[in-house]
């Protein structure tokens, strides 16, 4: 018997690095997108934590009235936030080296821009990494497609909206009450509740929650018995088992009789596609709505659309919402404007004399 021995070519350091980065045997897959994702997300997370705890007040409106957002400056977990970059900076790229000092950079809200830009780059790379790992494992690419919905939403509120409004100071603050403030001001200025794309997003989120609960409860209620009454039903499943763990025919029959036959899926694959697609498409539309309202293509305006035979206005809910919008608008940035935009835009009456 003849044995043939081949000398294995030594791989270069770069080659070994490439193999390690793209290996699916690592406990956590890195991938080429991960090479960029890891430092950007670590940077965004580190700066966010430091700024949330210790950042000094920021002159968000550019009128020399700093707003405190950090814990060490009197806030708690609910009221605290990383304050957006000052309106005095606008959309300018504002890294540390562009400021005269670190104190000036902090006063103008430099950390917000640093966090947001690194975060958006990081989550986009996370989405790319999902596709990359799917590709290496021979899977279909829909995990990354589903994740594109929250990526689009984050990009809309942190980047597209500030671009449309002309300043990063209009971006969403990085905190709980700051998020609510952003939502209230957005409603006041853009009437988002009357925008059809936002309505589709609400249907996507609430509908997705309903369908998830329905699916989970149906599956849990139609498990194939593998245990006794004294054991948890969860013990009847073994990871990787070939048999079905629940009876889809029973679930289909139950739901078809509860509502009607064609309301129930008889194909597990189409069912799970629907469960994924419904909320994803809804959030896509919401992100698209935010991106159009960024350039002031706002929600429907039905104000004073119903009048009686004498021309007097009969108020509808649209008029009630409009009054609420005006109230919210006069409250925000109260020292930055003499009048809210909706009131200041009306031509002043002429006076005789």
Curated annotation (Swiss-Prot):
UniProt-annotated location(s): Plastid, Chloroplast thylakoid membrane
Transmembrane segments: 29-46, 118-133, 142-156, 197-218, 274-288
Residues the entry annotates as binding chlorophyll a ChlzD1: 118
Protein name, as recorded: Photosystem II protein D1
Gene that produces this protein: psbA
Species per Swiss-Prot/TrEMBL record: Lemna minor
CDD domains reported in the protein's UniProt record: Photosystem-II_D1
Cofactor info, note text: The D1/D2 heterodimer binds P680, chlorophylls that are the primary electron donor of PSII, and subsequent electron acceptors. It shares a non-heme iron and each subunit binds pheophytin, quinone, additional chlorophylls, carotenoids and lipids. D1 provides most of the ligands for the Mn4-Ca-O5 cluster of the oxygen-evolving complex (OEC). There is also a Cl(-1) ion associated with D1 and D2, which is required for oxygen evolution. The PSII complex binds additional chlorophylls, carotenoids and specific lipids.
Top-level class of the enzyme under EC nomenclature: oxidoreductase
Residues engaged in binding chlorophyll a PD1: 198
